[in-house]
Curated annotation (Swiss-Prot):
InterPro entries, per the entry: Ribosomal_uL3 (IPR000597), Ribosomal_uL3_bac/org-type (IPR019927), Ribosomal_uL3_CS (IPR019926), Transl_B-barrel_sf (IPR009000)
Pfam families according to UniProt: Ribosomal_L3 (PF00297)
GO cellular component: cytosolic large ribosomal subunit
Subunit and partners: Part of the 50S ribosomal subunit. Forms a cluster with proteins L14 and L19.
Residue ranges of the region described as Disordered: 131-155
Function according to Swiss-Prot or TrEMBL: One of the primary rRNA binding proteins, it binds directly near the 3'-end of the 23S rRNA, where it nucleates assembly of the 50S subunit.
Family that this chain belongs to: Belongs to the universal ribosomal protein uL3 family.
Record protein name field: Large ribosomal subunit protein uL3
Tree of life domain: Bacteria
């Protein structure tokens, strides 16, 4: 990984390219982020930078976090995330990371927390086949067979079952950057990204773009 930034999802819209074709895009408020800490191989065993995003009041933070920000001499930030980079020599504590690190045509991976759907059955959660819907059937949208009887005498790990759906960390890979607006700190990527409006997103350069 060579570059990354934190952002906030604003929603989806559509724009037109030079040929007049419609492109569905997600609008992301990306940055500005501030470098709060640098980690090196000598002190931490790996190279990384810790960045903060989104202003927050001091009363919303714990005392350890308040001390962490004051030691770095940077404003209080709501979100703290770490990026492992190959080379961190170009970053200093207190420096800003802005959306202009990306340009149209770049490929990025976008990570977020998907929308929570609550408790769901296997049909909605995994797309399982239904049972017979006719009269006399005792299962329509139930799990069906979960295991054998005496042997093995248990249900194997990984068997699809009803449970909590959504609210998981999801990464969409290799999305194309369509437009960058440095003045408004906006990043437009082609397609959809995880999470509801206003949720935190982690944008990194794609490793599969080559």
């Amino acid at each position: 990984m060579k570059k990354g930034i934190l952002g906030r999802k604003h929603g989806m819209t559509q724009i037109f390219d030079e040929k007049g074709e419609v492109i569905p895009v997600t609008v992301i408020e990306a940055g500005p982020c501030v470098v709060v800490q640098k980690k090196t191989v000598e002190t931490d065993g790996y190279n990384a930078i810790q960045v903060g995003f989104g202003d927050v009041k001091e009363k919303r933070l714990t005392k350890p976090l308040i001390g962490h920000f004051k030691k770095a001499g940077v404003p209080f930030k709501r979100y703290l995330r770490e990026f492992r980079l190959d080379d961190i020599s170009g970053y200093e504590v207190g420096s800003e990371i802005k959306v202009d690190i990306f340009k149209p045509g770049d490929r990025v991976n976008v990570t977020g927390i998907s929308k929570g759907k609550g408790f769901a059955g296997v049909v909605k959660r995994y797309g399982a086949n239904r049972g017979p819907m006719s009269h006399g059937s005792k299962y329509h949208r139930r799990v069906g067979s979960m295991s054998a009887t005496t042997d093995p005498g248990r249900t194997f790990k990984g068997k699809i079952m009803p449970g909590h759906m959504g609210h998981e960390r999801v990464t969409i890979q290799n999305l194309e950057v369509v437009k960058v607006d440095p003045e408004l700190n906006l990043l437009l990527v082609k397609g959809s990204v995880p999470g509801p409006k206003g949720s935190l997103l982690i944008i990194k350069d794609s490793v599969k773009s080559k």
